[in-house]
Amino acid sequence: MTSLNPVFKIGMQISEMILAHESISKEEARLRSIEMLRAVGIPDPEKRMNDFPHQFSGGMRQRVMIAIALACNPSLLIADEPTTALDVTIQAQILELMIDLKQKRQDAAILIITHNLAVVAETCQRVIVMYGGKIQEIAPVKELFNNPLHPYTQGLLNSIPRPGREQHRERLRAIPGNVPSIMNLPVGCKFCTRCPVKIDICDTVEPPLVEITPGHSARCHLVKPVYEFSAGVNTNE
């Protein structure tokens, strides 16, 4: 929402993007801008076209950014931390808006980049977990939350407060250590310096991304043997 230029009117910023990508007249771009503001729930869009960003609340500016992103009808909307700096109520409204717009555009998809696992659980169908610039786990959202395979994913989920945890006096478990510098990553597994189940090979050999079950992949030397053992398969054969 800080991407809006504070010295230009909202309508000009939406129209400019449309004119940069499509061969249409300024009037057509203006009319589409009004329609996009209406689509994202901005009241009285014809009037608000002439307002400046400082005249909008944080949530309304986020809606304007979504309108700009969707104005040329893209097949993929990339939303990078779409709820950052918004209060919980406005976060819910923005997520509901994005889901609603996605449902109305059956041929479109939304890629959400976020650290907020509540946002992931609420909006996503499929999840890619990344650490150190590498994909560590891929799974359908329910599968990921119910059966996380990678130690990093498990650490993320264990650090989330849950209802009823206080009754069992269960402490939150933070991931130990610090995130390594992207300029000096470990040679082997990128998570090995913080992993509670690390073995020797993790320091020197980066594990491949392996499909463990249909649609569920993980990058860990221990995951496949552990899963096979838990499934009743003799890994020594």
Language-model features and meaning:
Residues T2-L4, M12-E28, R38-I42, Q55, ...:
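ABC-type ATPase nucleotide-binding domains, specifically the catalytic core motifs of the NBD
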Residues I14, I66, I90, I94:
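Hydrophobic anchor residue at the start of the ABC signature
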Residues E28-K47, D100, Q154-L157:
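Conserved ABC ATPase "signature" region
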Residues D51-F56, M60:
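Conserved ABC ATPase signature
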Residues A71-S75:
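A short, proline-enriched helix->beta-strand linker immediately N-terminal to the Walker B motif
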Residues I78-P82, L86-E170:
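P-loop NTP-binding/switch modules centered on Walker-like glycine-rich loops
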Residues P140-E237:
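Charged, flexible cofactor/metal-binding loops and thiol motifs
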